[in-house]
Swiss-Prot record:
It comes from Penicillium brevicompactum. Its cofactor is heme. Heme binds at residue 449. Pathway: Secondary metabolite biosynthesis; terpenoid biosynthesis. Keywords: Endoplasmic reticulum, Heme, Iron, Membrane, Metal-binding, Monooxygenase, Oxidoreductase, Transmembrane, Transmembrane helix. Its EC number is 1.-.-.-. It is an enzyme of class 1 (oxidoreductase). The chain crosses the membrane at residues 7-29. This is Cytochrome P450 monooxygenase mpaDE. Gene3D superfamilies: Cytochrome P450, Ribonuclease Z/Hydroxyacylglutathione hydrolase-like. It catalyses: 5-methylorsellinate + reduced [NADPH--hemoprotein reductase] + O2 = 4,6-dihydroxy-2-(hydroxymethyl)-3-methylbenzoate + oxidized [NADPH--hemoprotein reductase] + H2O + H(+); 4,6-dihydroxy-2-(hydroxymethyl)-3-methylbenzoate + H(+) = 5,7-dihydroxy-4-methylphthalide + H2O. It is a single-pass membrane protein. The keyword Transcription does not apply.
Amino acid sequence: MKSLSLTWITAVAVVLYLVQRYVRSYWRLKDIPGPVLAKLTDLQRVWWVKTGRAHEFHRDMHAMYGPIVRFGPNMVSVSDPRVIPTIYPSRPGFPKGDFYRTQKPYTRNKGAMPAVFNTQDEDLHKQLRSPIASLYSMTNVVRLEPLVDETLTVLSKQLDERFVGTNDKPFDLGDWLQYFAFDSMGTLTFSRRYGFLEQGRDMHGILQEIWNFMTRVAVMGQIPWFDEIWNKNSFITLFKRPTGFGVLKVVDNFISQRVSSRENDEKADEKDMLSQFLDIQASNPHSIMPWAPRAWTFSNVMAGSDSTANVMRTMMYNLLVDRDTLRSLRAELLEAENSNGLSRSLPSWDGVRSLPYLDACVLEALRLHPPFCLPFERVVPEGGITVCETYLPAGTVVGISPYLANRDKQTFGDDADKWRPSRWLDLSREDRVKLENSILTFGAGRRTCLGKNIAILEIKKLFPMLLLNYEIEIVNPENYQTTNAWFFRQWGLQAVIRKLPAPERDDTIEQKASIPPALNIPPSSSTVEVRIIDSGTLLDLRPDLFWTPDLPGLLKVTAPTYCFLISNGTRHVLFDLAVRQDWENLPPSIVAMIKSQTVIQEPRNISDVLDSDESSLGVRSKDIEAIIWSHAHFDHIGDPSTFPPSTELVVGPGIRDTHWPGFPTNPDAINLNTDIQGRNVREISFEKTQKGATKIGSFDAVDYFGDGSFYLLDAAGHSVGHIGALARVTTSPVSFVFMGGDSCHHAGVLRPTKYLPCPLDSGDTSLPCKSDSVFTLSPALPTDYTAALRTVENIKELDACEDVFVVLAHDATLKGKVDFYPSKINDWKAKEYGKKTKWLFYKDIENSIEGQK
């Protein structure tokens, strides 16, 4: 009997507690209007979110009740963007509500993981955000632009191969925009794409995993207490998959691979965002938690891609539906191309950052369809606040939905629900700032989105590339739909795509060249003699392996193989050795590759070339102090064993560990043991602390002889340890010869550029642009495509300097046009070799076009 009485007393006490809690909650906000059910329970909010149309219900509630509406017993929604600074101040004191607690990914072993965007603890937020904030500044983000260029190149290639020329077969363009956004962020974060673009599908189920995660947290965020029971309970997760598990698995795999490569002292550690995350934590182990890199990386994967794809789809849909705005944007891009040399294939940030109509379209897309469309909830601090002439006591959860703020008619006009980019044009500075500050898309105050600059960079580079190269038409626009599950996702952006013809050049207009960056080569009175040795070996190259796009008719290029004799007084070195005469004795895997991909004609050992020279030069193989490999591929390494053991072998970073032991000790090796047997091998380091380290243009460099006459340059990307060389050949006037190795295999990859636009009489008028290189480096062969692209850009700066003669290892246009060994090339400038040979590569283009005819 006593037990029964105790049970009843307990039950009554619980009921009374709940009743007083509801009454107190109802009473403290009783003057704030809203639906009756919402004042009593959060189930009203749950139902709105479950429909996938919560933003529409929120809009209707505010239309009915005004700018401040009660959405729950302790939750108030505000729609007036003028109070954004009040609710989202720059000072601490307005922590995020429990809605964000539900967005912490959970695993049974490690529990719930806070991240920059989901933590409520303001001190922890500062600890997580402050160390990495500078990485997301536009200054740092722009340094990663080549990584975005890499992904743009892959996207263009996939569109061409899959959808162009398919008789207007529709495809889901929205999916491909998302693939681009994810692979861009993957490259920025890991130096590796996830593979969405190459495979044309959701890799590892990441997209579905993120959508499932957001769908769950959207509902749980309305009743966060239940999330602790259902999603973050170690017992229940024995029987169900934890939230965010799939994304965390991808993150953990990437991190473990990177940590493992570092522990093994592998040299190919990229300076991508993951490496920077790990470096930051390692340099501050006492102040930064060991799990911080995991949290930072999770944020990049989870929030850094889907939200950007959302804006891309919004902008693309509205441009395709409103063709007038599409024409206006394309006209601006064409003007930038014609006047400022904007590249079609890889529009640069400098070329697109300040285009007014492009900027207006991006802002309008951000305004009209923000990626997150539920209120950004904050907890009112002690003392309460007054918003919209209404007092909110401490502890009240208050928030503004970006969807409502961004469409406020008092701020943006009666057509706030319409796509109209022109609303952003011809504004005073004051009015422009007012509109920008009224957009809540990236948040406001202390918790603004870190990834904003990355998103803007990707979008402003993507759309010029698409609109200058393709004609895109929407198919069945009525099938375009949206769903709001915290993420505001779009579906059904079906389109057809056609390649636009290359623009006709206006030969009456001289293209104005931009001034290239200063090379800042250290002054010196020392020079070397440079002789180009044509080894006599010819290689048949497949163009698609080395550059894009393919040109019909240009199916094969027969290329020479050059190496260089560098003489500093009585000291002589060779830069590369071409192909060894007995190439059939190379490792079997290399021989098989050669037989399947190329044809070698008339190979000669460079030692024989030197020893059989009948000129008065008199430099023999025994006189060679060192052989310098630009890299370790078969067509550059020759046969070092034909030189005396006293000849040193000099190689780039990482070659020693990557290539030896050689064959046959290592049956998979691509080099032979005899290449280094009995010989000193010196590996060049470009670390700033090394003796002779310097900077040449954008290249890290080493002064080889120590007198400023000859530099080795870190020309990474094509292969491990790839290097170039720069020789000072005259001092009055000063001139240099740059030896590019295999940085690229066709001068059309280097030219034209904004620094070096093609002259009016340089070739066929169907070329893409006067200041846009004819070809882009193919991603097929480089071991590090991003670094390879960066190297090409660095060479373009050298190539634009009238004092530098750029020689590529396989440039057939030089044969018969310049002096070869045993003559030296030091007088190239006096003989105007640069001017005479710079545009000869256009002959390949003309032959290709003629062959197509």
